[in-house]
Regions:
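Conserved active-site loop region of the serine DD-peptidase/beta-lactamase
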Residues: 33
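Surface-exposed, flexible loop/turn segments at secondary-structure boundaries
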Residues: 106, 174, 195
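Compositionally biased, proline/threonine/alanine/serine-rich low-complexity intrinsically disordered stretches
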Residues: 189-205
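A common structural junction motif
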Residues: 82-91, 182-192
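M16 family metallopeptidases and their MPP-like homologs
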Residues: 1-11, 20-24, 36-89, 95-148, ...
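Detector for C-terminal structural segments
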Residues: 122-123, 171-175, 179
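Short, conserved charged micro-motifs
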Residues: 15, 72-76, 174-177
Length: 205
């Protein structure tokens, strides 16, 4: 099964953008992030799972994703939900996690500008998303200046599991009962072409 859980997030051109990138790095943006360590390294239910914040001028998508074993679909959804909720309050970003995220984001910068095309793309992002002209000049310093308190203040504003829409692609006969047991809300069925099926016809597929 392939699991997605997402909701809207602020535009890229917002004062918290660098903090958002850092928080996402801890939650699901890297191999050592919480979501991947949980589902891949601990549970062994997925080859790779995480979270993404897409870039956009307006409201954009924040989502968790997890391709998992069919027989662990329900359990994986539960773990994803736990991670989304935990970082908001019960399990805030630790000092070690913040330090690792800061290192990951800043040390990656030289590799992102190895070619003229890459440099041009970064300059294009400034124009495309309405970022400050000094966005990349000050990026590393702003990442390094973030504190655990910044992460704790941002997490409940960025990560909103109660507003998430869940999308699960898989063998319905094997996963539907478990998903229903989670009581996440109304279930809609979508065919391979993206069409929402009426309840009557969905029942036979």
């Amino acid at each position: 099964s392939v699991i997605f859980a997402g909701h809207l997030a602020p535009p890229k051109a917002n004062p918290d953008e660098i903090a958002i990138e850092t928080l996402n790095s801890v939650l699901g943006g890297t191999f050592t992030s919480r979501v991947n360590l949980n589902l891949r390294e601990d549970k062994h239910w997925s080859y790779g799972a995480g979270t993404i914040v897409w870039d956009a001028r307006g409201q954009r998508l924040f989502f968790a994703y997890a391709p998992v074993q069919t027989d662990k679909t329900k359990e994986s959804m539960t773990e994803v939900s736990k991670e989304l909720r935990a970082i908001r309050s019960d399990k805030p970003v630790t000092g070690d996690e913040l330090t690792q995220a800061q290192s990951t984001l800043t040390l990656a910068l030289p590799g992102e500008w190895e070619t003229m095309n890459a440099v041009a793309a970064s300059l294009g992002n400034i124009v495309r998303f309405g970022l400050p002209d000094t966005y990349y000049d000050t990026y590393a310093d702003r990442v390094k200046a973030l504190t655990g308190r910044d992460m704790s203040a941002l997490a409940p504003r960025l990560v909103q599991p109660d507003h998430a829409v869940w999308v699960v692609v898989g063998d319905r006969a094997k996963i539907e009962t478990g998903i229903r047991e989670l009581n996440l809300g109304e279930i809609r069925y979508i065919d391979a072409d993206g069409r929402v099926l009426p309840a009557a016809s969905a029942g036979s597929r």
